[in-house]
UniProtKB/Swiss-Prot annotation:
Protein name per the record: Quinolinate synthase
Residues making up the signal peptide according to the UniProt record: none
Positions in coiled-coil regions: none
Family classification: Belongs to the quinolinate synthase family. Type 2 subfamily.
Catalytic activity reported: iminosuccinate + dihydroxyacetone phosphate = quinolinate + phosphate + 2 H2O + H(+)
Chain positions recorded as iminosuccinate binding sites: 34, 51, 122-124, 139, 208-210, 225
GO BP: 'de novo' NAD biosynthetic process from L-aspartate
Biological function: Catalyzes the condensation of iminoaspartate with dihydroxyacetone phosphate to form quinolinate.
Binding site for [4Fe-4S] cluster: 96, 182, 275
Pfam families named in the record: NadA
GO MF annotation terms: 4 iron, 4 sulfur cluster binding; metal ion binding; quinolinate synthetase A activity
Cofactor binding description: Binds 1 [4Fe-4S] cluster per subunit.
Length: 318
């Protein structure tokens, strides 16, 4: 559940970054931002990372206020880990197509049809789905977590079918997959990937495991956003075709300014494939959220208590 406020009518300060820094001190706040946020937000964040890193930071912060520049399931996770702290999300409409693809009631029925199965849910899901899960995972640790389970343990993996299939291939484990997907990674075009490879024959193809198999089979490296960033920095390659949300390219260019990064387009005429939900957050909205102490993330106590256990299990197994 989210607490909304009317759009602000006041004038923005001229020095927006300076005003945000002042509010951060006043509130004893920390700004956590995902790699898919706009560059201006990435540059002002106290911690920038992928879902695993952001969860670890949320679990360990001593700040009184958490300003989460990401999407709602990320802010929910921060609230679950910090039930007594103020957690702010700049735009309440910053949802997630993957999380939306797994409705709690339908998933509960799906779970009942597969008794004796342990439920591993990708962190890109709602608090209600987390509460129905045994272990949460991220793209950084999904393979590692599955490898720690007994070989005869039956597994449900939700909600991303592409990540689930990738984990099955990496571990050799059979899993029952919920058929959800991410609109960004689902719509990358193999045809346009091959066209780019012809245009940039020396380019390495790096891709997120949420991509379809048609994309991953061409990849030189597959990994989480953090893994892709690290690989691009260490590789001797000079050109990279990037198969994930292009927000990460800002950090890739900062890490390796002499290298070229080409965003993989989708099937439309767009030359990139931005997440429309991630891009709802702006520096201006972040300022208003801090200035007004709202919109605040709130969740039922019972849901938070149930969802906390699988998150803690993930952190312990990572």
């Amino acid at each position: 559940m989210f607490t909304a406020v009317a759009p602000p009518q006041e004038t923005l300060p001229r020095d927006l970054v300076g005003a945000i820094q002042s509010l951060k001190k006043e509130l004893n706040a920390v700004i956590l931002a995902h790699y898919y946020q706009e560059a201006a937000i990435q540059d002002i964040a106290d911690y920038l990372g992928d879902s695993l890193g952001l969860s670890q930071q949320a679990a360990s912060t001593d700040a009184d206020v958490i300003v989460f520049a990401g999407v709602h399931f990320m802010a929910e996770t921060a609230k679950i880990l910090n039930p007594h702290k103020l957690v702010l999300l700049p735009d309440l409409e910053a949802g997630c197509s993957l999380a939306d693809s797994c409705p709690p009631r339908e998933f509960a029925e799906f779970k009942q049809r597969h008794p004796d199965h342990l439920v591993i849910s990708y962190i890109n899901c709602t608090a209600e789905i987390k509460a129905l899960s045994d272990i949460i995972c991220t793209s950084s640790n999904a393979v590692k977590i599955v490898q720690q389970l007994p070989p005869d343990q039956k597994i449900i993996f939700a909600p991303d079918r592409n990540l689930g299939r990738y984990v099955m291939e990496q571990t050799g484990r059979e899993m029952v997959l919920w058929q959800g997907s991410c609109i960004v990674h689902e719509t990358f075009s193999e045809r346009r990937l091959l066209e780019l490879k012809t245009q940039y024959p020396q380019a390495e193809i790096i891709a997120h495991p949420e991509c379809e198999k048609a994309i991953l089979r061409h990849a030189d490296f597959i990994g989480s956003t953090t893994a892709l960033l690290n690989y691009s920095g260490k590789s001797q390659g000079k050109e990279f075709i990037v198969g994930t949300e292009p927000g990460i390219i800002h950090q890739m260019e900062k890490l390796s300014p002499s290298k070229q990064f080409i965003p993989l387009p989708n099937n439309s005429n767009c030359d990139c494939n931005e997440c429309p939900y991630m891009r709802l957050n702006t520096l201006e909205k972040l300022y208003w959220a801090m200035q007004r102490r709202s919109p605040e993330i709130t969740l039922p106590e019972a849901t938070m208590a149930a969802a906390l256990k699988p998150i803690q299990r993930m952190l312990a197994m990572s």
